[in-house]
Amino acid sequence: MTTQQTIKVQLIRSPIGCQESHRATVRGLGLRKIRSTSELVDTPEVRGMINKISYLIKVL
């Protein structure tokens, strides 16, 4: 069995006032409220989303 690597991210800043695409990216990562966390599979797509909104989140 292969185990997939995961990345845990936490929303630390509100996406209010940000670009619509950045808000959609936050929702796409499964984050809703401030301090909410989401555990995601480590893929290039997810890393790109994290890089796009790095000023809003923290990688745990």
From Swiss-Prot:
The keyword Ribosomal protein applies. Part of the 50S ribosomal subunit. Gene3D superfamilies: Ribosomal protein L30, ferredoxin-like fold domain (3.30.1390.20). The keyword Oxidoreductase does not apply. GO terms for cellular component: cytosolic large ribosomal subunit. Belongs to the universal ribosomal protein uL30 family. InterPro entries: Ribo_uL30_ferredoxin-like_sf, Ribosomal_uL30_bac-type, Ribosomal_uL30_ferredoxin-like. This is Large ribosomal subunit protein uL30. SUPFAM superfamilies: Ribosomal protein L30p/L7e (SSF55129). It holds the Pfam family Ribosomal_L30. GO terms for molecular function: structural constituent of ribosome. It comes from the Bacteria. The gene is rpmD. GO terms for biological process: translation. Keywords: Ribonucleoprotein, Ribosomal protein.
